[in-house]
């Protein structure tokens, strides 16, 4: 007969064996798990290294393509804007590099930049319609000019006024606005907070231009309000007064509520202005110049780039 002490020793031995088994088993499982994790980590590092190599290779190809474009740029745009002038408009989200690069190519193409007009945040937010209307409908309107009664929103009204003021009408029967009247309009819009501007003439006057180039940014957040619509309508309202208007945005500008996307989605605007959706890249900058040349030569509007709604990568030859 087993005594109570023997029974206690037996139970203790069983529990000790279980404890030893658990320790040994957990050690084995732990080693196996750690080994598996090490293998997975090694595989992930290998994948990351491979992806970095691919990224570097793609960056090198992009850099080579841009260098190639830079080398050929002079030949591609040679004299395509010869004897013509361009006024550059920029939105608050336009990048300095884009504005400077495209303005430089205008000159390389044989054209001149009469000046740069910067639209303020108050302008693109389009929340000051009454304030702008009071400026537009004041005595600053150049003599003999008439604003369109069909344009009632802030962006369109300003585009109409600045189109009359800053662009040489394609119809030779329409007289150009004089320097003094042009200055009156610009100063009024500047002093009321809608624009700032920079001239490139020795007499400090912003001269009349044959075409307009509107440079904007990229993707806008969904809560951007009327910014994209305002810029698109502004650009479209400029167009009837000159020989061509082109709206150029960065990567993302053809998406959502951004200006290029708005212009392309509206059949009327798309028939009035040309657009480029990759002005942050050398091919897009060259295309902007070729697009202006096409408009100045009496060609049709086009939607160029790689984004949604583009009908061609660049201007067909």
UniProtKB/Swiss-Prot annotation:
**A Pfam family reported for this protein in Swiss-Prot or TrEMBL:** MctB
Question: GO terms for biological process?
Answer: copper ion homeostasis; monoatomic ion transport
* Chief location bin: membrane
Q: What start and end residues bound the annotated signal peptide?
A: 1-28
Enumerate the UniProt keywords alphabetically. Answer: Cell outer membrane, Copper, Ion transport, Membrane, Porin, Signal, Transmembrane, Transport
Where is the protein found, in the record's own terms?
Cell outer membrane
GO MF terms held by the record: porin activity
Single GO cellular component term:
cell outer membrane
Listed InterPro entries? MctB
- Its domain of life reads Bacteria
* Function, as annotated: Pore-forming protein, which is involved in efflux of copper across the outer membrane. Essential for copper resistance and maintenance of a low intracellular copper concentration.
What's the family?
Answer: Belongs to the MctB (TC 1.B.50) family.
- What this protein is called in its record is Copper transporter MctB
Q: Which organism is it from?
A: Mycobacterium leprae (strain TN)
């Amino acid at each position: 007969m087993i005594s109570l002490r023997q029974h206690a020793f037996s139970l203790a031995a069983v529990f000790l064996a279980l404890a030893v088994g658990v320790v040994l088993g957990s050690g084995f499982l732990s080693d196996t798990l750690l080994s598996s994790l090490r293998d997975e980590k090694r595989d992930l590092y290998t994948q990351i290294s491979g992806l970095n190599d691919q990224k570097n290779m793609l960056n090198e190809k992009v850099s080579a393509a841009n260098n190639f474009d830079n080398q050929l740029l002079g030949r591609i745009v040679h004299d395509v804007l010869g004897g013509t002038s361009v006024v550059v408009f920029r939105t608050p989200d336009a990048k300095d590099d884009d504005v400077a690069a495209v303005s430089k190519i205008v000159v390389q193409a044989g054209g001149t930049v009469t000046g740069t007009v910067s639209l303020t945040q108050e302008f693109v937010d389009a929340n000051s319609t009454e304030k702008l209307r009071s400026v537009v409908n004041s005595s600053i309107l150049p003599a003999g000019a008439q604003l369109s009664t069909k344009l009632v929103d802030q962006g369109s009204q300003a585009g109409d006024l600045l189109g009359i003021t800053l662009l040489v009408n394609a119809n030779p029967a329409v007289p150009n606005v004089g320097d003094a009247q042009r200055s009156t309009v610009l100063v009024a819009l500047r002093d009321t907070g809608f624009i700032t501007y920079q001239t490139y003439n020795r007499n400090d006057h912003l001269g009349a231009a044959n075409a307009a180039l509107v440079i904007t940014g990229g993707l806008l957040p969904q809560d951007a309000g009327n910014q994209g619509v305002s810029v698109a309508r502004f650009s479209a309202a400029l167009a009837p007064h000159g020989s061509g208007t082109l709206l150029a945005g960065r990567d993302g500008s053809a998406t959502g509520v951004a200006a290029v996307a708005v212009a392309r989605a509206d059949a009327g605007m798309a028939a009035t202005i040309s657009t480029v959706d990759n002005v942050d890249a050398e091919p897009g900058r060259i295309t902007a110049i070729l697009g202006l040349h096409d408009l100045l030569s009496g060609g049709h509007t086009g939607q160029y780039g790689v984004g949604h709604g583009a009908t061609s990568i660049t201007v067909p030859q």
